[in-house]
Amino acid sequence: MGLFKPKLRSDIQDRIKEIDPRVFVSIPHVNGLPIAENTLCQIYYTDDNLFIDGSGQSFNLSNEKISAIEIKTDVEIQKQYVSSVAGGITGAIVFGPLGALIGGRVKEKKIKNTTRYLIITYTSDNEIKYLGFDITYTPKALEIIKLFNKNNLNKNIIEL
């Protein structure tokens, strides 16, 4: 990640001018659309609609059909066992063969991978459906949630 934004393709620039979104992000698709997983999608959020372009297809979701836009965080912890050659050599020099055994012993190393997903819940044909996108490296996607929540404060009230 650098200080400069990458230059957008001309077709994406034209689409931004056409739609005039409040928020625009490019993020990988995870599930919910009839396109391949990890396909890079352009999402244009306006006050009325959510437009999604990906894999040569365009999708339009009215904000009235959207019931929630949320973030789900998935944490995966991997354990790796590594031995230290340098520790073994240093141990051998300082303490002899016993030092080599202690210095070069196998150690457990934990790697924590955190993945963040943008989950869009909507209703289609009287059925609740979901769209999922990977936003681990796209903090700007949080703006979509803020705008949606700001514009839909009383929407989730259910009349009994």
Task: Describe the residue ranges of each PLM region.
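Phosphoinositide-dependent membrane-docking surfaces
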Residues: L50, N60-I77
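Anionic N-terminal interaction surfaces
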Residues: M1-N49, S55-S58
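Short, surface-exposed beta-strand/loop "edge" segments at domain boundaries and coil↔beta transitions
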Residues: F51-I52, Q57-L61, N126-G132
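Acidic, Ser/Thr- and proline-rich intrinsically disordered linker/docking segments
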Residues: G2-I12, I69-L160
